[in-house]
Amino acid sequence: MPYTRDDVAKLIDHTLLKPEATHSQVRELVEEANELGVCSVCVSPSLLPLPFDLGNVKLAVVCGFPSGAHHSDVKAAEAARAVAQGADEVDMVVNLAWAAGNEFEKVEADIRAVREAVPGAVLKAIVE
């Protein structure tokens, strides 16, 4: 069964992760996201809380961005604060050194620390 445009749109996170991003630019992103029917907008946690309504899209934030090399406790605190400020989803950057070095027990512990900090939020592990 082929996917419709709306089916595909609901799988997309519309992102604005430039370090100089402003609330005005995020507002434009949210307007575009609502017009396109995408799932969420993803922004840096420093932009939270957002001073406007999101309409029908969810709010995602990055965690440990962009390197993933942050300490697990820092990632967990960053994620928890973002969720407390309105984030529905957390896109956590995986520590590439651990993954590339086959240190998957560290990768798992890192993800687990963030998961435990935000049990009610959607958590995605991403590679940058």
Task: Label each region the model flagged.
Residues P2, A9-S46:
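An N-cap/entry alpha-helix motif that binds or orients negatively charged groups
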Residues D7-H23, A60-A76, A97-E103, I126-E128:
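Active-site mouth loops of central-metabolism enzymes
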Residues Q25, L29, E78-A82, V107-V114:
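A general structural detector for well-ordered alpha-helical segments in enzyme core domains, enriched
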Residues L36-G37, C42, V94-G101:
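Glycine/Thr-rich beta-alpha phosphate-binding loop at enzyme active sites
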Residues V38-E89:
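Active-site cofactor/substrate anionic-group-binding motifs, chiefly glycine-
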Residues C42-S44, D88-V94, G120-E128:
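Short beta-strand segments at enzyme active-site cores
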Residues P45-S67, N102-I126:
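Alpha-helix-loop-beta-strand connector modules within alpha/beta enzyme cores
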